[in-house]
């Protein structure tokens, strides 16, 4: 049944799912995502957005937030929370020019509460702390440099990720071009964004959404283009993945993986993280048709009654993988060929210089938790801006929240490195453990956070570094460690060897059993424990790993082999078993 028919009760393939959720009413009545956002912008009595607009601004790339550190104090003073918005830019493949960077640096300095640029796991940047009077200026500033934030949140296809591989320059360029094409093809066609934020002309006549439908998708939808053997984008965190298959340095097609996703809800066993299923191989010329077919099948078959079960991963488990795949083949007019062979061998960023096959040099900078700000003794934000003033190539934001200074000619390497070192952007002493640890934003800005993540991780990693040293593990040894402040999973903890999921202030669920390459879901080992208890558990487990492991055996693989945790093979069956 098509999403455009708007029945009062949803039925899919003969199964009644229930009455449509209120979010479906909201989208249907929004006049293609316009709502009354323009009227809200004029209301200076409150710093926030009201009623449906609170949800609708997400489709325009923004979340309403407030500073939770001062929420209680403002309440005592009879003030509303310090409402502001976070904006996530649409940057397919994460490539940004020096000119664009200097513009976003200036806006962050002059018009945000926190003055920072936050690189994210969605391979883009976020502004945090933009007050209502500056929101339209923000969109117009971005538009003037060729950037927008259309569909980086909400029930749509979000920012399309692409492996940040500067070495395989020709293959990366081709894959990146497909990431851009997919992003444009699946973008909402409504004129609402231009009308509201860019003072665009209001054109009479109906909007149409041929792929997304008038009710858009049942839930968020995430897409990647990945170049093996590097799984930096974490394919199993995403609804739709195009695995690049190359021959002689040329892209010839994609293996298509569908139905990954990490979000869950505490206490609801109908929700779980899930690996993506391999549908098979397609030639390049069928890429956009297949992307649209997967999206439209999820549009029509996804659960619009229960948002907790609305993502593609649950649709596949409900209707069956083969049934979903057959529908995609029917809609795209193709038959999937057997998948071509590939292997993932890594997913962390290689920090430092590498030389591409095109002779250009690329410097990957480790940005702890993606926060680009001038810290005491480490003026990172100033440093990146100074590099941008002289850099002749581009920047590439990675899905690991780092930044690549890409396309540096040999005669400029020394200048770029000197600028990076003098501003604290290169630290030769940073450990492999710190490089391979990651956290989402969480407090104080994320309204969903249940526990600290970004502010918690640096000192926690220091403790873990001490544990590794205590057990005489080599300096290059590390554990993929991730912290996410709530079970929505932005920090991708559900693909880590050690994953911490926030449960309450100072308390986390401890998950073990993921692997280094991001192809296995970890399982809960201990529930609702403190950071002190977590470190005690890690100390004991690392001690066993150091003394009992096989040659080259990763921590996650060891926990499975040693029987410390059971392997999750089929999430619906195994994750809570």
From Swiss-Prot:
Gene3D superfamilies associated with the record: Sulfite Reductase Hemoprotein, domain 1
Assembly and binders: Alpha(8)-beta(8). The alpha component is a flavoprotein, the beta component is a hemoprotein.
Enzyme's top EC category: oxidoreductase
Described function: Component of the sulfite reductase complex that catalyzes the 6-electron reduction of sulfite to sulfide. This is one of several activities required for the biosynthesis of L-cysteine from sulfate.
NCBIfam families tied to this protein: CysI, PRK13504.1
Keyword NADP set for record: yes
Cofactors demanded by this protein: siroheme; [4Fe-4S] cluster
Swiss-Prot/TrEMBL keywords: 4Fe-4S, Amino-acid biosynthesis, Cysteine biosynthesis, Heme, Iron, Iron-sulfur, Metal-binding, NADP, Oxidoreductase
The record's free-text note on cofactor binding: Binds 1 siroheme per subunit.
Source superkingdom: Bacteria
The organism of origin for this protein: Vibrio cholerae serotype O1 (strain ATCC 39541 / Classical Ogawa 395 / O395)
Family: Belongs to the nitrite and sulfite reductase 4Fe-4S domain family.
UniProt cross-references to Pfam families, sorted A to Z: NIR_SIR, NIR_SIR_ferr
Biochemical pathway: Sulfur metabolism; hydrogen sulfide biosynthesis; hydrogen sulfide from sulfite (NADPH route): step 1/1
Name assigned to this protein: Sulfite reductase [NADPH] hemoprotein beta-component
Catalytic activity: hydrogen sulfide + 3 NADP(+) + 3 H2O = sulfite + 3 NADPH + 4 H(+)
């Amino acid at each position: 049944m098509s999403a455009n028919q708007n029945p009062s009760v949803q039925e899919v393939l003969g199964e009644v799912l229930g009455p449509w959720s209120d979010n479906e009413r909201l989208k249907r009545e929004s006049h293609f995502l316009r709502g009354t956002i323009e009227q809200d912008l004029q209301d200076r009595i409150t710093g926030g957005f009201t009623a449906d607009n609170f949800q609708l601004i997400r489709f325009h790339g923004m979340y309403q937030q407030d500073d939770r550190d001062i929420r209680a104090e403002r309440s005592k003073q009879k003030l509303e929370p310090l409402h502001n918005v976070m904006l996530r830019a649409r940057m397919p493949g994460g490539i940004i020019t020096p000119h664009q960077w200097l513009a976003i640096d200036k806006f962050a300095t002059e018009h945000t509460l926190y003055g920072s640029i936050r690189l994210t796991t969605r391979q883009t940047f976020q502004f945090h702390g933009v007050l209502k009077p500056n929101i339209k200026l923000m969109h117009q500033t971005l538009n003037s440099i060729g950037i927008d934030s259309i569909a980086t949140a909400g029930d749509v296809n979000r920012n399309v990720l692409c492996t940040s591989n500067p070495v395989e320059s020709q293959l990366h360029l081709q894959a990146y071009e497909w990431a851009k094409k997919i992003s444009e093809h699946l973008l909402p066609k409504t004129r609402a964004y231009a009308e509201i934020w860019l003072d665009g002309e209001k054109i009479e006549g109906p909007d149409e959404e041929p792929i997304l439908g008038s009710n858009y998708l049942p839930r968020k939808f995430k897409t990647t283009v990945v170049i093996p053997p590097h799984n930096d984008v974490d394919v199993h965190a995403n609804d739709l993945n195009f695995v690049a298959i190359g021959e002689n340095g040329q892209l010839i097609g994609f293996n298509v993986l569908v139905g990954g996703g990490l979000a869950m809800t505490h206490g609801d066993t109908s929700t779980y993280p899930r690996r993506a299923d391999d549908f098979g191989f397609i030639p390049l010329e069928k890429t956009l048709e297949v992307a649209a077919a997967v999206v439209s099948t999820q549009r029509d078959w996804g659960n619009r009654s229960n948002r907790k079960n609305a993502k593609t991963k649950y649709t596949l488990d409900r209707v069956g993988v083969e049934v979903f795949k057959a529908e995609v083949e029917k809609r795209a007019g193709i038959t999937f060929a057997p998948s071509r062979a590939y292997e993932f061998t890594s997913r962390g960023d290689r920090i430092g210089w590498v030389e591409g096959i095109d002779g250009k040099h690329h410097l990957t900078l480790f940005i702890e938790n993606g926060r680009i700000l001038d810290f005491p003794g480490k003026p990172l934000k100033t440093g990146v801006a100074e590099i941008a003033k002289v850099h002749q190539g581009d920047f590439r934001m990675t899905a690991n929240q780092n930044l690549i200074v890409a396309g540096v000619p040999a005669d400029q390497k020394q200048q770029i490195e000197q600028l990076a070192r003098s501003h604290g952007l290169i630290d030769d002493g940073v450990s492999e453990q710190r490089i391979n640890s990651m956290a989402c934003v969480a407090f104080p800005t994320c309204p969903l956070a249940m526990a600290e993540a970004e502010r918690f991780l640096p000192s926690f990693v220091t403790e873990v570094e001490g544990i590794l040293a205590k057990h005489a593990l080599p300096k290059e040894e590390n554990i993929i460690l991730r912290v996410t402040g709530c079970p929505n999973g932005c920090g991708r903890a559900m693909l880590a060897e050690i994953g911490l999921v926030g449960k309450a202030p100072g308390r986390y669920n401890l998950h073990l059993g993921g692997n280094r390459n991001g192809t296995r879901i970890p399982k809960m080992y201990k529930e609702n424990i403190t950071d002190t208890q977590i470190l005690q558990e890690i100390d004991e487990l690392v001690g066993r790993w150091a003394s009992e492991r096989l040659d080259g055996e990763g921590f996650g693989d060891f926990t499975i082999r040693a029987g410390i945790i059971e392997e999750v093979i089929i999430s619906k069956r195994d994750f809570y078993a």
